[in-house]
A protein has these predicted regions:
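Beta/alpha (TIM)-barrel catalytic core signal, keyed to glycine-rich beta->alpha loops juxtaposed to Asp/Glu
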Residues: 3, 124-312
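A short, structured active-site edge motif that brings together acidic residues
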Residues: 75-88, 119
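Hydrophobic residues in well-ordered beta-strands that form the structural core
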Residues: 52-53, 66, 80, 152, ...
Length: 314
């Protein structure tokens, strides 16, 4: 497993990380704890060093799970996210200083860590970031040696830009072949500020694996049932043809491999956060990710032209 620097934080992380939202059962069907443990243990065995979670995943249960499984692995880098008041009905976003401090202490206890490696604000609004109160709390915790680095997990170009201008050192964003706008629009700022990028949704929730029929149906408790309309999904599946020429049968053996290698080919990405729900899926992803060069310059350039043409015709 190759490692990359996490921006200017001084932290090195495996270029493939384990995301735990899918393991928590949120957005999908529940997963037995034994299956969760198996994926975490397999990730460790394969050299994964970054584990991404949030205090809201499984209502805190996923943090506790990682705390148990990683207790004997202090070298593992844990990323957690704060900012969801799960005691409210319904749950709501909350970023006032008192709540952030209390949430941090609860996460620290569940994770069994005196020092948490990376803490991110979890989908804060533009106004929350602009006020800077929540970020100031995390900076105080970093100054006190309670966390090693902090940042934000955000949606959208404008919010990401505000976060960067606020001086955050770590940014988590969705990034894949069909969702690259944030990274493309903010490339200069990210590079100039040396921001560490954690890329999630790298396979677009399974779409980029290329294994769905046009009439794919999702269970009612699967978040993807509300993510796309039938027409949207059929259009997206047809657009996979833009990626298929990257599959060469030797180094790039599947559409899934091509999509993952597209993300890893971007040197701004510190870590591609995977979301497997089984050890088998994790094995496949890590095997197919390969090593640098992930896609040849010619293949990558031609792919980007095809993707740009898709956006132009949308």
């Amino acid at each position: 497993m190759q490692e990359r620097p996490l921006g200017s934080t001084g932290i090195s992380v495996s270029e493939l990380g384990l995301g735990t939202w899918g393991l928590s059962g949120d957005g999908y069907s529940p997963l037995p704890e034994a299956d969760q443990d198996a994926v975490i243990e397999r990730a460790l065995a394969l050299g994964v060093t970054l584990f991404d979670t949030a205090d809201s995943y499984g209502k805190g249960a996923m943090e506790a799970r990682l705390g148990e499984r990683l207790a004997a692995h202090p070298q593992a880098v844990i990323v957690t996210k704060l900012g969801t008041d799960r005691e409210a009905s319904p749950a709501r976003k909350r970023f006032d200083p008192t709540f952030i401090r209390e949430s941090f202490e609860r996460s620290r206890e569940r994770l069994k860590r005196d020092v948490i490696d990376i803490v991110l604000l979890h989908n804060p609004s533009d106004s929350t970031l602009a006020r800077g109160e929540a970020g100031a709390v995390l900076q105080e915790l970093q100054n006190a040696g309670r966390i090693r680095a902090w940042g934000a997990s955000v949606e959208g170009v404008d919010t990401a830009r505000i976060a960067i201008h606020q001086g955050i050192k770590v940014l988590e964003v969705a990034y894949n072949a069909f969702h690259s706008r944030t990274m493309q629009h903010l490339e200069v700022e990210i590079r100039n500020q040396n921001v560490g990028i954690l890329a999630h949704s790298v396979l677009a929730h399974g779409l980029l694996c290329g294994q769905w029929p046009f009439d794919k149906q999702f269970a009612n408790n699967d978040h993807r049932s509300e993510r796309w309309t039938g027409d949207d999904l059929r259009r997206r599946i047809s657009q996979l043809n833009a990626i298929r020429p990257c599959v060469n049968g030797s180094t790039v053996t599947s559409l899934r491999a091509a999509a993952l290698r597209y993300v890893l080919s971007n040197d701004l990405v510190s870590c591609a956060v995977l979301g497997p729900r089984s050890s088998l899926q994790l094995d496949q992803l890590i095997r197919e990710a390969g090593r640098d060069p992930y896609l040849s310059p010619e293949a990558l350039g031609a792919l980007q032209i095809r993707l740009d043409n898709l956006k132009a015709s949308a």
